């Protein structure tokens, strides 16, 4: 934790603190007391990933005149002289399109590059991570997060407050349930999470209101299991003026973008080149019925999730 404080450049008031057994029990009354000696408190960040992504998209579209399109898949990419021809497919209408580009940055997440570039894509290993949502605060964590230091498969878990409810997660499985585009928590993963909550908290029954799963795209090192693979990112040149971003975390999106631009344009972009006073547009829930109708007509809103 001292190293964690050092890397974060934390002020004295923000550094981690040791907490006695007595005070730990006062903070977390449902935490099991057997083998409990003490705990420590540290500060970390929390973000709403969905709203952050939507805020970034709004900023790109409204300030930087970018174009963001949903449900439009890249089916193939061909090189033609100094240009790339990109074949697109609309999932909603079945229409096909073709566009040209001088430069490409592919950030395709869990998916390989299409067509002729599939074999030269960055090699990835998928890891599924399931979560449970508990209604309210049944574990009495009192708006604090709890870091569970050790699981049966040598990992860690978190219990976190979230919008008036509690989130428990996560797992790390190579054989995830569902598809890459629609993963879901398996019974085994749900049982795993409940079992570990009961290991640390004095509760008989765990009732969850929902579960979900996400897929991490990790850089395949050919040797380690997913839980041992570093969560870093790589930026590789697939072809001239064509790079792929793979791996990484959402919290590093700005640094990853700068590195990608440096590599693609062979220019020294620096952090100070970014105008931080031009803040990301805040995503707010201010839409009314006319906005919904406009979104359905013009922005390929096919499901309630798309609109939200």
Regions inferred by a protein language model and the residue ranges of each:
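Short beta-strand segments that buttress and anchor functional surface loops
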Residues: 41-42, 86-90
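A structural signal for short hydrophobic beta-strand segments in well-ordered beta-sheet cores
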Residues: 74-77, 158-159, 235
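Short, hydrophobic/aromatic-rich segments at coil-to-beta transitions
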Residues: 82-86, 142-143
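Flavin (primarily FAD) binding-site architecture
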Residues: 106-119
